[in-house]
Amino acid sequence: MPGSNTANTKFSTWNYTRPDYSEVKRKINDCKNKMLGAISYQMFRDAWLDVKKEIEYMEYQEEIIYIRHLCGIDYQYSLEEVEIQNKEEPSVYALRDECSRIAAASGYRNELEQEFGKQIFVYVEEHRAAENPDSMRLRSEESALKMQYRKLMAKGSRDDEALYQVFRKLIEIRCELADSLGYNSYIDLGYHIQRRGDFGTRETADFRRNIKKYVTPAVADIKEKGIDFGYPPALAANPEELIASIVAMFKDLSYEAGSYMEEMTRKELYDLETRANKRNILFTCCMLPYEKLPFIIGNYTGNGMEAGYTVHEFGHGFAFYTAARKQPLYELHRSSPAVNEIHSKTMEHFMFPYLDMFVGEHKKDYIRNHLMQQLENLAYRCAIDEFEHQMYDRHLSRVELCELWVDISNRYTPWNRIPTEDIQQGKCWPRQTHIVETPFYYIQYDIAQISTYEFYLKMKSNSGQAWADYMRLIGEGGSKSFYELLEIAHLSNPFTGNTLEDICRPIVDELYSLL
């Protein structure tokens, strides 16, 4: 494989070469045959690892152009390249998954688990969606629809009909995909894709009920007070000034965090500018395998909330950066979304002692608004999650989808009033990006939020221990299950007993004290 790109220092100078997908498949097929013909663990292991190296380098090249596409750079060219990726990937992943199943069924499985951990075979189940020609075709169609959605969003489209048609077709294709793979519904497939092997629909339904019981009433009461919860302006007038403050914060947190930010800034692994064709209101962290580096994307316009969003994404990046230097396999550099979001959301709270650098004298207002926003989001995300479960479980017309959303919204977020005419015209279905891009992901922000609150409470009593537990958690990456990772970080199970109530109560009390 070609050498490292990082010798070129800045990301903007990194070379992109479209993967030769035919050659990638030929090499993986050769590896598959070597695995089948292996007469020793070493031979089998080497061929198995070579499959992973091919995928890792392919995805690395793909990620370079995908980042440029999201940033609106060389837009037409990068768009065409990403569309080619979407067409080619399913057949490559079908071969990858075949090799994974060979490894899972082989006599060398125990030795692989001893060397790399049992979690590597838990992830094999997630990739069932490439097992037959129908599913590969449907995956390609799904990717094309998501690309169509991104184009509409990049243009700032408010074309309700166009957005709805993408939404409607995605529901149909995903249900067909689940059926082609033998799942009872897309809900089951969606849970597998999101690595939710540790908890299922029963746990998430109980979680939603508890949020509705303990969080919704408090938020509704505070909403009635008519307080302006708009975020204060940030001190940083531009992205460069914001990055300087984040660098100072990370350097003070720890040597490891400072080293991470030094490399991020030296290689300019971020883009916070606004420009034509860049995704609107997008804050995200992309992962560059092979180089083991993240890339942060944002649209910074000087708002304090945007400063927090940016720190959130740098938290994702720090977790990936740390795990990639500790865990031997790329798929172990990230965990399930319910854990990954603990990494990033907790970094938002580690930001609190440094708020003087970000919002100056508005520190109290920032904390108040942050706590309020997160509590309100707990309720809103539960509403989205219940909507997702029902929209894939029932065949509903456009108006019926709107009526369903209104009913759910009234129960979780009664402060959000939806005009009657929007219901009648079928215009009030939720426009949440996660529904289109990553079904069943959104609730995992909430599940992570409970652990984040627990970290926050620990920070206030013992900040050193909180940071040590945080570093332990991110270093493990995805090498262990959800519950095992919580235990390693000394965090409670958010689904058991009175955990949710016990953790949320002091957060609500603090918010009331700041009103």
What are these regions (language model features)?
Residues 309, 315-329, 350:
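Catalytic Zn2+-binding segment of zinc metalloproteases
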Residues 212-214, 323-324, 334-362, 371, ...:
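Post-HExxH zinc-binding segment in Zn-dependent metallohydrolases
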Residues 70, 123-125, 310, 318, ...:
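C-terminal, non-catalytic "cap/extension" segments appended to globular domains
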Residues 227-245, 366, 371, 375-377, ...:
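Long, K/E/R/D-enriched contiguous segments that form extended
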Residues 1-236:
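A well-structured
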Residues 226-290, 303-304:
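Auxiliary, metal-adjacent structural segments of Zn-dependent hydrolase domains
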Residues 291-311:
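Short pre-active-site segment immediately N-terminal to the catalytic Zn-binding motif
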Residues 80, 295-299, 327-337, 366-372, ...:
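Short beta-alpha connecting loops at secondary-structure transitions
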